[in-house]
Amino acid sequence: MAFLKKSLFLVLFLGLVSLSICEEEKRETEEEENEQEDDDKSEEKRFLSLIPHAINAVSAIAKHFG
């Protein structure tokens, strides 16, 4: 009976450790995805802020040659 208790406790302990590791990896993956989304959004904002400058440059060139 004592052997079965020890085996059961060992199985439960190893299961909890495994579950903890999986949850930690999942959390890290979610954090990396969130960081990637934030990076993508900031790149998009930078690109969108350049559009008016590009339009002004094109219109200035057109006025110069036109």
Curated annotation (Swiss-Prot):
One of its GO terms (cellular component) is extracellular region. Residues 23-44 form a propeptide. Residues 24-44 are annotated as: Disordered. It is found in: Secreted. It comes from the Eukaryota. One of its GO terms (biological process) is defense response to bacterium. Keywords: Amidation, Amphibian defense peptide, Antibiotic, Antimicrobial, Cleavage on pair of basic residues, Secreted, Signal. Residues 30-41 have a biased composition (Acidic residues). Residues 1-22 form the signal peptide. Expressed by the skin glands. The modification Phenylalanine amide is found at F65. Belongs to the frog skin active peptide (FSAP) family. Phylloseptin subfamily. Has antibacterial activity against the Gram-negative bacteria E.coli and P.aeruginosa, and the Gram-positive bacterium S.aureus. No hemolytic activity. This is Phylloseptin-H5. It comes from Pithecopus hypochondrialis (Orange-legged leaf frog). The gene is psn7.
